């Protein structure tokens, strides 16, 4: 007979790497064309003026300018880039 108890197995011990999602450039910040504005899963925020959307729903600036968050209706948020700050 064994004198030591066999160690039991566990079904835990896994975790996925974080995906670094979220807002990368905030309202009023200056951006250049191609800068990533938001990394997201699904369209929590929709692209507005001068903002493109990648296949993974990443929003990025199409022109140099300033970031502005807006509400297109009661619920939906959009992000736009304008060449002037006002």
UniProtKB/Swiss-Prot annotation:
InterPro entries: Ribosomal_bL27, Ribosomal_bL27_CS. GO terms for molecular function: structural constituent of ribosome. Keywords: Chloroplast, Plastid, Ribonucleoprotein, Ribosomal protein. SUPFAM superfamilies: Ribosomal L27 protein-like. It comes from the Eukaryota. It is found in: Plastid, Chloroplast. One of its GO terms (cellular component) is chloroplast. GO terms for biological process: translation. Pfam families: Ribosomal_L27 (PF01016). Belongs to the bacterial ribosomal protein bL27 family. NCBIfam families: L27. PANTHER family: LARGE RIBOSOMAL SUBUNIT PROTEIN BL27M, RIBOSOMAL PROTEIN L27. HAMAP family: Ribosomal_bL27. This is Large ribosomal subunit protein bL27c. It comes from Porphyra purpurea (Red seaweed). The gene is rpl27.
């Amino acid at each position: 007979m064994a004198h030591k108890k066999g160690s039991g197995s566990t079904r835990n011990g896994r975790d996925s790497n974080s995906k670094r999602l979220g807002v990368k450039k905030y309202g009023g910040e200056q951006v250049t064309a191609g800068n990533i504005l938001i990394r997201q899963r699904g369209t929590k925020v929709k692209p507005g003026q001068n903002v493109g959307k990648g296949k993974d729903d990443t929003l990025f600036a199409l022109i140099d300018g300033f970031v502005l968050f807006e509400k297109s209706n009661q619920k939906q948020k959009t992000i736009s880039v304008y060449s002037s700050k006002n």
